[in-house]
Amino acid sequence: MSNDGGSITGALRAWKGGDRNSIRRLWEAYFHRLVGLARGRLDRAARSVADEEDVALSAFASFCRRAERGEFPRLDDREDLWRLLFVITTRKAVNRARHDLRA
């Protein structure tokens, strides 16, 4: 992702500035990475109940809701964004796997 840092940071800043259309650029840049991350965190048993795309969708939606509420005031660039999306996605995948194992 190092070659598109300006466009990602620009999209993030535009979105924080009120341009709701710029979230699409962020989605396109990160969704497949989030799916891969979730895939690595879910075992086969968990994936039969909720696949990695569900986790990635949930993580991105959670990020959007929380960012709109102003919960991430230090979110300034693509590195901040990736770290945050990584944490949200990892936690959701781990929680989903735990929940599915209990069921």
Where do the model's predicted regions map?
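Intrinsically disordered or compositionally simple regulatory linkers and C-terminal tails
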Residues: 1-3
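Hydrophobic alpha-helical bundle segments that form small-molecule/ligand-binding pockets
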Residues: 42-46
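Amphipathic coiled-coil alpha-helices
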Residues: 11-14, 22
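Arg/Lys-rich amphipathic alpha helix in sigma70-family domain 2
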Residues: 40, 68-69, 87-103
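Conserved RNAP core-binding helix
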Residues: 5-12, 27-31, 47-70, 79
